[in-house]
Amino acid sequence: MSSSQTLVVKLGTSVLTGGSRRLDQSHIVELVRQCAKQHEKGHRIIIVTSGAIAAGREYLNYPDLPATIASKQLLAAVGQSALIQVWKQLFAIYGIHIGQMLLTRADIEDRERFLNARDTLHALLDNKIIPVINENDAVATAEIKVGDNDNLSALAAILGGADKLLLLTDIEGLYTADPRSNPDAKLIPEVFDINDELRQMAGDSVSGLGTGGMATKLQAATVAGRAGIDVVIAAGVKPDVISKVIDNEPVGTLFHGLKSPLETRKRWIFGAPVAGVIIVDNGAEKAIKEQGSSLLPKGIKEIKGDFSRGCVIRIQSLQGKDLAHGVAHYNSDALRLIAGHHSQEISQILGYEYGSVAVHRDDMIVS
């Protein structure tokens, strides 16, 4: 068995409906079987599901509604609960729990909400619960919509620290031309660089129910790839497609992620304005420099400046030496209260807890 992987599986409307106007229950059963099989092997599966509007239409027996945003949001509100019930009932067959997360762009772009969403996602995964993510279409406006579930799945992959992102659709992958209209179209098995030529090859969605086409899948592959995540575009009807991706078998089109995503992250953390300084004791200094450890509240001696959770801060020694840059897991007021205390005391002192660390080692670049 391959070592444990985190895989985001994005299921488009065309995959969930089979191109029809209703959910294809038999195909969803098969996709759940594949996900459950990998979950039982120890892999961490995150599902990004489309289909809420299609499910709402079916549930309400195809009402004749005007093509307005309000009508779509009505269908999404009704359909989302119906859709999540389908996932819940099917995974329950395998004794697997799911957890629903509804996101908007604001949850991603606001750093504090980003951290909250990330913590929730990791908590679900750590407790062997499969997250089922969708955009919150019932309330999202154009200003706060991610816009399509392809890009949402890329953001979910980054939130979840995924190894791979699988975009399941109604064609085999990226072709040199539209295979539905051009018999000479050839499948492109591997992509190392997404350039303008590739973008010109991308066609448009034809299902009518979805919001994403090949162009949005290339956008998603670009976003995830910059974070070092491999992306596969493949046909949802391909037998055992999820297992094949986990096992690195050739299927669809593989977009290779950057091999050194840490460099991108390092540039972001070092490039971000420093909002404050955390002074640490000698023990914390040694743990950070020699062991690459997270910074615990116990090792904090002083907080300089006022900053929010999610801001980039500088970590310094008692002698004023720069030790690291990192992302604060608590705001400055909270850190002042818990400084010098054991992590077990955080919830007692603050009345809430965002975890046991002040700055996580994954969010820290040692100087």
Swiss-Prot record:
Principal place of residence: cytoplasm
Compartments it resides in: Cytoplasm
Enzyme class, first EC level, given as a word: transferase
SMART domains registered for this protein in UniProt: PUA
Keyword Transferase attributed: yes
Known pathway: Amino-acid biosynthesis; L-proline biosynthesis; L-glutamate 5-semialdehyde from L-glutamate: step 1/2
GO CC annotations on file: cytosol
UniProt-annotated binding residues for ATP: K10, T169, D170, T211, G212, G213, M214, A215, T216, K217
EC code(s) of this entry: 2.7.2.11
Gene3D superfamilies: Acetylglutamate kinase-like, PUA domain
Annotated substrate binding sites: S50, D137, N149
GO molecular function terms noted in the UniProt entry: ATP binding; glutamate 5-kinase activity; RNA binding
Catalysed reaction equations from the record: L-glutamate + ATP = L-glutamyl 5-phosphate + ADP
Keywords: Amino-acid biosynthesis, ATP-binding, Cytoplasm, Kinase, Nucleotide-binding, Proline biosynthesis, Transferase
Domain PUA: 275-353
Keyword Lipoprotein set for record: no
A Gene Ontology biological process term: L-proline biosynthetic process
Family under the similarity heading: Belongs to the glutamate 5-kinase family.
Function as written in the Swiss-Prot or TrEMBL entry: Catalyzes the transfer of a phosphate group to glutamate to form L-glutamate 5-phosphate.
Protein name: Glutamate 5-kinase
